[in-house]
Amino acid sequence: MLEIDNQTPLESDFLLLEKIANVLAPTQIIELVLVSDETIREINKDLRGCDYATDVLSFPLEAIPHTPLGSVVINAPLAQTNALKLGHSLENEIALLFIHGVLHLLGYDHEKDKGEQRQKESELIKAFNLPLSLIERTQD
């Protein structure tokens, strides 16, 4: 199940994200928060010590029954900019970032694993007919 908190004026169709959430975590709640550049920069600085805006952040919650799996926070203006730059829809860019974030909630870590997150992202991108993700675009 997907809970959405859109704190931006950007409008998007979230049906695809609901389908992705149901595939990745069919019995769990995932919170999606769409925020501004300034807000994600503040979150990144406060919680990670990184004083810059980024595209997506993931925050897993403790394994407490009846609580969400975690939160995926997406920089909506940056997603819109990247979608235009890369020639695909805002919905597709948000879906790519959402997949990336949810995989982190599920324990994947592309900075430490041996390609497992990249492989899982690729499988999901093909299954949902999405363009290349950031992790695939930066692949060697």
Swiss-Prot record:
Q: Where in the cell is it found?
A: Cytoplasm
Chief location: cytoplasm
Sequence positions that bind Zn(2+): H100, H104, H110
Task: Cite the SUPFAM superfamilies for this sequence.
Answer: Metalloproteases ('zincins'), catalytic domain
Requisite cofactors? Zn(2+)
Q: Could you tell me the keywords of this UniProt record?
A: Cytoplasm, Endonuclease, Hydrolase, Metal-binding, Nuclease, Ribosome biogenesis, rRNA processing, Zinc
Instruction: Name a GO molecular-function annotation.
Output: zinc ion binding
Keyword Nuclease assigned to the entry: answer is yes
A biological-process GO annotation: rRNA processing
**GO annotations of cellular component type:** cytoplasm
Report any Pfam family annotated for this entry.
YbeY
Q: Which domain of life is it from?
A: Bacteria
Q: What is its EC number?
A: 3.1.-.-
Free-text remark on how the cofactor is bound? Binds 1 zinc ion.
State the family named in the UniProt similarity comment for this chain. Belongs to the endoribonuclease YbeY family.
Q: What does this protein do?
A: Single strand-specific metallo-endoribonuclease involved in late-stage 70S ribosome quality control and in maturation of the 3' terminus of the 16S rRNA.
Protein name as annotated: Endoribonuclease YbeY
Q: What is the organism field in this record?
A: Helicobacter pylori (strain ATCC 700392 / 26695)
The lineage is: Bacteria, Pseudomonadati, Campylobacterota, Epsilonproteobacteria, Campylobacterales
